[in-house]
């Protein structure tokens, strides 16, 4: 159940704070706004989404496979505005009963799961009919030049340096192919200024399990 990336975990812990200061915190608030009931957050990392959950959420099961990130997540859980339970687990094998969640939250995780199809199938399995999939991910670029740069990055050092992360995944298409209906979708660049990099194109949205 454990996925160990000690160097990446240390780097990500620092980088996530800087990202939030640069505007990611606002995206995290939008990601979970309006949620209610029981939520499963997959690949919850070091818990940067936890402060933003609204009070209508009755509980969050925060699943994280990397031990160091999970320890940071556990430390952050008591300060969350809603009850949080931390668990070890993989996106492809969630420790959750069928049709038991009102929402599943995916935040910068579908870029690095070994199998998006299986991970999204699991998300659909644990959601009740009509439940929401909320997603905030970096994705394949819409411009040919940046797509070429992403393919080069994915074929060389990027996955090795970033714990299996891939930049050229068409995550929105994968969500639709998994049987979800996308009801909200915002495409943007992050960070918003400077020269775009392989991980600059982002999406934030919501999908519904029929």
What are these regions (language model features)?
Residues 15-38, 48-52:
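Conserved alpha-helix/loop element of class I SAM-dependent methyltransferases that forms part
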Residues 40-93:
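Class I SAM-dependent methyltransferase SAM/SAH-binding core
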Residues 92-104:
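A short acidic, Gly/Pro-enriched loop at the edge of an enzyme's catalytic core
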Residues 102-115:
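A short SAM/SAH-binding and catalytic strip from SAM-dependent methyltransferases
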Residues 117-129:
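A short glycine-rich, Lys/Arg-flanked "PGG" loop and its adjoining helix->strand segment in the class I
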Residues 130-138:
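Conserved beta-strand signature within the Rossmann-like core of class I S-adenosyl-L-methionine
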Residues 164-179:
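Short alpha-helix
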Residues 186-210:
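Core SAM-dependent methyltransferase catalytic element
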